[in-house]
């Protein structure tokens, strides 16, 4: 059985995905992130919630105003330190903490932002303060690719709130992205958090802070990414049956992600390779013919999946290298199955292009 050169399921997937990870930024950059912290008007005192205990005194308000009116983060941090020293139980404390986070967010330098937020944690030391600061510092750690710190903070967040869907989803995907980049340190957490996130989404446990459009994204794009991540890890461990199940599920939820089809093609290619090897070891006859037929059916599936991935990637610069990587393989397989001709190949690709909206 002379057929196109077999490159291996994981090799195919890795080469294609490397094309979109080549810039060095984590794949999590496209994944869920925490809502931006609110900013407060300069000099405006934070407003306490009426159901959060005693009304603040004038002294508390004045101390809080020193934080909000501070010229820069360092001045605000110093004022916040004075505030918590004098009024540690104030109902304004959460809003003072949020203001520090908002001040830090104004700095566009991620390294400086991390330093600021870590300093804020050093001053605002109560557990409720950390609950306010941690989401922002987690986001900053991820931007800086400080993954050890990011998973440390994530663990703290989830110990306090095990059903924090944003953290579960984000970090499950990031952990498997890291495994794909040869850093398997965070796989145990990811394999624990991804199923939990899937369960929360599929049972419609919508977090109150997500609006309708955000929740719709979780139920489609992000749910699909979670299944895709689990499928990727199954491929990495050689469990191609599980990988196929997870990736098929991902594709059924979001049919427009070309990367899912790249991975599925890798799984099918592994199935094809096994059948092709069996054909080579068989004597001519009915059994060999039947096995050959099955192998060619797998090749046809690969052709379809490659065409789908290339079609869906059309027009998106992010996926140009993916298209280039797959195009040669697709042409080779297609021409093998069509008498050394590529007639009709472009029409097949065009069929799978994403409809214009």
Each language-model region and where it sits:
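Terminal, low-structured helical/coil segments at or just beyond the last alpha-helical repeat
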Residues: 206-212, 280-281, 285-290, 296, ...
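Short coil/linker segments at helix-helix boundaries
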Residues: 74, 111, 132, 173-221, ...
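Short coil/turn linking the two alpha-helices of tandem helical-hairpin repeats
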Residues: 67-70, 104-108, 143-145, 172, ...
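Bacterial N-terminal signal peptides
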Residues: 11-23
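N-terminal leader/linker segments that initiate helical-solenoid repeat arrays
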Residues: 27-100, 104-115, 123-132
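Short solvent-exposed coil/turn linkers within tandem alpha-helical repeat scaffolds
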Residues: 86-94, 122-132, 144, 159-166, ...
């Amino acid at each position: 059985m002379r057929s196109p050169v077999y490159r291996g399921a994981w090799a195919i997937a890795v080469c294609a995905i490397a094309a979109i990870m080549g810039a060095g930024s984590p794949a999590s950059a496209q994944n869920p992130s925490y809502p931006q912290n609110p900013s407060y008007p300069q000099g405006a005192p934070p407003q306490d919630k009426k159901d959060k205990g005693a009304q603040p005194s004038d002294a508390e308000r004045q101390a809080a105003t020193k934080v909000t009116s501070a010229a820069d983060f360092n001045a605000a941090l110093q004022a916040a330190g004075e505030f918590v020293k004098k009024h540690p139980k104030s109902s304004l404390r959460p809003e003072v903490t949020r203001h520090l986070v908002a001040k830090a967010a104004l700095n566009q330098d991620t390294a400086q932002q991390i330093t600021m937020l870590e300093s804020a944690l050093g001053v605002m030391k109560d557990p409720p303060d950390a609950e306010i600061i941690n989401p922002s510092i987690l986001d900053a750690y991820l931007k800086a690719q400080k993954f050890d710190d990011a998973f440390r903070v994530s663990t703290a967040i989830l110990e306090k709130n095990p059903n924090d869907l944003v953290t579960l989803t984000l970090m499950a995907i990031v952990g498997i992205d890291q495994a794909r980049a040869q850093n398997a340190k965070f796989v145990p957490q990811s394999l624990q958090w991804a199923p939990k996130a899937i369960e929360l989404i599929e049972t419609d446990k919508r977090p109150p802070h997500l609006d309708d459009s955000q929740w719709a994204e979780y139920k489609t794009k992000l749910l699909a990414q979670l299944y895709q991540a689990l499928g990727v890890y199954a491929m990495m461990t050689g469990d191609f049956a599980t990988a196929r199940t997870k990736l098929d599920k991902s594709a059924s939820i979001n049919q427009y992600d070309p990367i899912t089809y790249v991975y599925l093609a890798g799984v099918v290619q592994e199935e094809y390779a096994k059948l092709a090897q069996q054909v080579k070891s068989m004597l001519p006859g009915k059994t060999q013919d039947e096995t050959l037929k099955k192998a060619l059916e797998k090749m046809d599936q690969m052709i379809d999946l490659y065409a789908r991935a290339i079609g869906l990637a059309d027009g998106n610069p992010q996926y140009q290298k993916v298209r280039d990587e797959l195009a040669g393989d697709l042409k080779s397989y297609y021409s093998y199955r069509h008498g050394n001709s590529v007639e009709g190949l472009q029409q097949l690709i065009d069929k799978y292009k994403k409809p214009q909206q």
